[in-house]
């Protein structure tokens, strides 16, 4: 029998202490179950029960961040095949003016608060839960058909894009608080492809 439970191990590592063994986790998408809260939660819970990871990194559908701003998808029925994007919120530079702060009751955001609460109920307090959240720039990058479009818009209208990033940041700052209230212990804060000079210079990123 292990000396420590999953939460003990994670808290010891955070405190700079050495647990009885390394703490590990693995995550993946279950595309065929991602189009609703219950399916997403069940997939994560089943994966946890199968392998007994030390923490759960929730892997929701990536575009939950932008659906409430107008992203539309065709849901995949294949466990290993991504959803098909069929409409993007941003088609031209003027469309950025439509991006405002979202209420947390918005459909996709509220749905994923439910995902967190269902997983917490399913695995209990001993397993720390991290919810995936992208940076504002990464979220903006999912609103366009081609990331190069965002880079071009950033060069053309930097003040406009910075204002949009502020609205995205405000939305997800409030959302992070609600995720904690729903049962999340922390965030997996992802830059996705934007932490690369292949996409944008360090100066522009700053």
Segments predicted by a language model, with ranges:
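Short, low-complexity intrinsically disordered segments
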Residues: 25-28, 51, 67, 73, ...
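A contiguous, low-structure linker/loop signature
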Residues: 64-102, 118-126
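Segments that shape or occlude catalytic/ligand-binding pockets
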Residues: 37-62, 66
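Active-site loop segments of alpha/beta catalytic cores
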Residues: 1-34, 43, 47, 54, ...
């Amino acid at each position: 029998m292990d000396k420590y439970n999953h939460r003990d191990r994670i808290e010891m590592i955070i405190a700079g202490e050495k647990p009885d063994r390394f703490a590990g986790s693995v995550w993946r998408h279950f595309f065929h179950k991602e189009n609703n809260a219950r399916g997403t939660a069940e997939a994560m819970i089943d994966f946890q029960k199968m392998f007994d990871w030390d923490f759960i990194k929730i892997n929701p559908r990536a575009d939950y961040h932008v659906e409430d701003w107008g992203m539309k998808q065709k849901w995949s029925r294949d466990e290993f095949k991504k959803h098909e994007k069929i409409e993007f919120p941003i088609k031209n530079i003027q469309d950025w003016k439509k991006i405002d702060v979202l209420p947390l009751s918005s459909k996709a955001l509220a749905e994923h608060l439910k995902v967190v609460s269902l997983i917490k109920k399913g695995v209990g307090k001993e397993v720390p839960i991290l919810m995936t959240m992208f940076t504002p720039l990464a979220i903006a990058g999912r609103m366009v058909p081609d990331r190069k479009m965002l880079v071009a818009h950033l060069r053309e209208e930097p003040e406009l894009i910075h204002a949009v990033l502020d609205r995205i940041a405000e939305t997800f700052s409030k959302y992070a608080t609600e995720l904690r209230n729903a049962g999340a212990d922390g965030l997996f804060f992802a830059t996705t492809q934007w932490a690369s000079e292949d996409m944008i210079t360090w100066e522009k990123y700053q």
